[in-house]
């Protein structure tokens, strides 16, 4: 909903700040206007060490998202805001207008027409221990591990002008390190559990290699005892299962065992573990 718009007003410590909320429509207009102004002074994309800074593409991407939300059922003539303390115009647009969907489409097209963003598709490992090895879905992996703030060193920039960054409109990148692995990795790989783990319901959403749901593919029959076989390549780059091979402490052949019982490790967990 709407918030107090301060604009370029500068307050001193003892000044009374504006606290009255502006309407939802005014807030949308303010965000869009500011992004349009900023986009005129920013490059479409950055590269190298400047990856992660705001760009014209990021401004247009934010406008696109704002316009999509604005046109959605939640804000476009919603039923929220029926009390005098919270009038509708603070929560969204009081009346539905289908032209807001046209504005959302146009905003999305503005991003597409930049011709700088694409799905980074590469099925050959570019670096690491096995450069040149066939690995379906390697491009999906590269998006999350390109921490050198440069282009993936595989000549991909010939096809993708900014390497694996071609898929990112606006990202926040930490420096090199193992923060992500510590949050989400298995305990034997240095994981601390603070980031949480994937749920089985989400695991089941990954299709088979032919795009069909598990249990519906004739070419890739699903075996619950071997859940990773025949799955979409993104499965192996997202999910850790019993028998996964993951880099750990320089060991590229480290095997993760999640089973309980004889020989179980700190990676083991029981049924129903959240």
Which residues make up each language-model segment?
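Aromatic-anchored glycine-rich loop motif in surface-exposed flexible loops
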Residues: 1-56, 65-96, 274
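Aromatic- and Gly/Pro-rich amphipathic surface segment
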Residues: 268-272
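An aromatic- and glycine-enriched ligand-binding surface/loop that stacks and positions planar moieties
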Residues: 36, 53, 57-60, 67-267
């Amino acid at each position: 909903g709407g918030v107090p718009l301060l604009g370029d007003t500068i307050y001193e410590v003892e000044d009374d700040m504006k606290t009255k909320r502006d309407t939802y429509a005014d807030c949308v207009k303010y965000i869009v206007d500011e992004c349009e102004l900023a986009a005129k002074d920013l490059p479409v994309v950055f590269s190298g060490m400047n990856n992660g800074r705001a760009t014209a593409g990021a401004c247009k991407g934010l406008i696109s998202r704002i316009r999509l939300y604005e046109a959605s059922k939640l804000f476009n003539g919603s039923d929220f805001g029926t009390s005098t303390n919270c009038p509708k115009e603070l929560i969204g647009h009081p009346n539905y207008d289908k032209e807001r969907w046209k504005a959302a489409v146009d905003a999305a097209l503005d991003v597409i027409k930049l011709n700088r963003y694409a799905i980074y598709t590469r099925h050959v490992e570019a670096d690491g221990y096995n450069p040149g090895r066939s690995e379906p879905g390697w491009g999906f992996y590269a998006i999350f591990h390109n921490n050198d703030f440069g282009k993936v060193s595989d000549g991909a920039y010939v096809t993708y002008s900014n390497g694996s960054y071609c898929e990112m409109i606006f990202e926040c990148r930490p420096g090199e390190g193992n923060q992500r692995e510590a949050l989400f990795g298995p305990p034997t790989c240095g994981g601390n559990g603070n980031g949480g783990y994937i749920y089985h319901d989400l695991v089941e959403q990954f299709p088979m290699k032919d795009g069909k749901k598990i249990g519906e593919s004739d070419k890739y029959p699903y075996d619950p005892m071997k859940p990773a076989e025949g799955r979409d390549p993104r499965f192996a780059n997202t999910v850790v299962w019993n028998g996964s091979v993951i880099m750990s402490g320089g060991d590229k052949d480290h095997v993760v065992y999640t089973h309980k019982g004889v020989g179980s490790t700190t990676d083991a967990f029981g049924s129903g573990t959240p």
